[in-house]
Amino acid sequence: MAAPGARGASLSGLLPAQTSLEYALLDAVTQQEKDELVYQYLQKVDGWEQDLAVPEFPEGLEWLNTEEPLSIYKDLCGKVVVLDFFTYCCINCIHVLPDLHALERRFSDKDGLLIVGVHSAKFPNEKVLDNIKSAVLRYNITHPVVNDADASLWQELEVSCWPTLVILGPRGNLLFSLIGEGHRDKLFSYTSIALKYYKDRGQIRDGKIGIKLFKESLPPSPLLFPGKVAVDHATGRLVVADTGHHRILVIQKNGRIQSSIGGPNPGRKDGMFSESSFNSPQGVAIADNVIYVADTENHLIRKIDLEAEKVTTVAGVGIQGTDTEGGEEGDKQPISSPWDVALGTSGSEVQRNDILWIAMAGTHQIWALLLDSGTLPKKSDLKKGTCIRFAGSGNEENRNNAYPHKAGFAQPSGLALASEEPWSCLFVADSESSTVRTVSLRDGAVKHLVGGERDPMNLFAFGDVDGAGINAKLQHPLGVAWDEERQVLYVADSYNHKIKVVDPKTKGCTTLAGTGDASDASSSFAESAFNEPGGLCIGESGRLLYVADTNNHQIKVMDLEARTVSVLPVCKSDSAVVDGSFPREKQKTVPKVPKSAAHIGLPPVTVHPGQALQLRLKLQLPPGAKLTEGAPSCWFLEAEGNEWLLQEQTPSGDIENISNQPAISLQIPTHCLSLEAVVSVVVFLYYCSADSSACMMKGVVFRQPLQITSTQPACAAPVELAYAF
């Protein structure tokens, strides 16, 4: 065996053999044939260890989520290791994370697998450990992460792009590399077969790695990485994407939370406010008591009706799409990582919010969702609900063009609409090209405003320079806001930790607020400090600029007249529509029903829409027995296959006193999706025998069929749910 890393192995040494394998896999028919090919490949490359031993992690690197720095040839010896070379700004790297999370759920370090994130920064701001910490928290990364700020391992292995996954054997030997996103099946196949291969040879160790999650040290906060903010100009309310808490907040001007929708955990569910869920939402837009949300990691556009207190999906199918054309009805059209939204008009004579513009970061494009039938520049008539590409080829570029489909964006992340003449355009914060661009609402032409470089393939032209046009330099801007009164554009220059202002007439770009340090200070514009601000919006008739100061977990308020910065004191309101509860407590999950639980079928009951049916528990304990004090005796409602029946219901409750048992009220929805349904009441009781010599957990399931009629029958008598344990 060669000394660890002695030969300076690189991915190029794997390329011929892995390329041959992947061609052979294309010709294989059955899964067994494919598995055998991978197994044979491993037999081949396993003998090349002297040439393909990776270099050790350099000493002195900063680590996250571990108790101490890790060594490939000590701590990781005996493990199959997946190295994820990533940079936290990159949307493609973000797209890989769900695959890694799924792999971690399937195989743990006890099984012999460990994932290590190797953070190799693109932008200077991303080399700073505190900023990587924020990203680790924001994206719920729970595996070890090393800050390879100088890209030492990247260069040693000749990694060429983000993301790149490198799979190592238990002796630090290179096995596979996967470049880019979209390789989930190969990742699972290669990893599982490698684990089996080395387990058969007795080379896998099941020892645990010392994991210390950074997120466990995070103090509670009303906001967690707020991404975007919008103002309801009719009422002055703020809408905040509380991204890290996976929820949307409606906040009064004084900071009191009026409504909290979703959270605290990620999910993908439509319905009433109390049951709906989001996954790292970003962009928000509000008009006429309706909020549109870029539900980024669900790859959806959601609609929040504040009057009906209901959430629905209006675009996307819930999985990442690769379509770069679109044209399907919204909820049938796959989309990819929408990052911001803006309400606007299709250009009809009547100015109305009939289009939702979408910054589609995942496909590097600008899309449109038709909220009413209309037309887009260079498009024929489009029907209501159509979700379609407006500008951008789908290639990650900084390419301007008079033809919108030939232009190229690089992870567009912020939108602002200037519908008035002479502008009539969308301003776009194009984060990976470090530019602000414009898209004409008249003909779709894409033009440069500030930042970046002339070469459309150069995505590394970033900096922090005030100037005009291409002489101005930004670093990964994420947000823009149009000031109609002053006719200027505000820019969240995120990785420079500044708010800048652009005059579109002169293309002049100057710093408005922020010292440039990643810090937190509320003072004058010149002395204030931000930490990766991600979104901003104009309020109070142009007097205030609200800023989502993402890594400071705050909404900052910039007074454009007094030129001061303050913090909005976000706090819970006693009259909030939904308790936001910082974060909201987890809803109870239904415990597993004991095998001994009785299942009782009840005779059908006839009910009508809108009726309240009373279900009364009548449970009897054995003689002398009593409920176990402090144990969670409880009931739950279930309606498998008919979940619509439980909307707006109280889904569970406690049983605290056997002599005063709860009555469960089942409100039949006014709009029923079926004329027959079954609701189950699941009961769990914890009780002790008379002499307290034994305590037990028992269960019973009552199954109540419902026959729903449109004619109003006589009021149904309460249903008794009787059972003796």
Swiss-Prot record:
Q: Which domain of life is it from?
A: Eukaryota
Q: What is its main location?
A: cytoplasm
What is this protein called in UniProt? NHL repeat-containing protein 2
Give compartment(s).
Cytoplasm, Cytosol
Give the species this sequence originates from: Mus musculus (Mouse)
Function per UniProt: Required for normal embryonic development.
Q: Which PROSITE patterns match?
A: THIOREDOXIN_2 (PS51352)
Among Pfam families, the record links this protein to:
NHL, Thioredoxin_8
Which cellular component appears as one GO term in the record?
A: cytosol
Write the gene name. Nhlrc2
Give start and end residues of every NHL repeat: 212-254, 265-307, 335-369, 409-439, 461-505, 517-561
The answer to whether UniProt assigns keyword Repeat to this entry is yes
Q: Which UniProt keywords apply?
A: Cytoplasm, Repeat
Per UniProt, subunit arrangement is: Monomer.
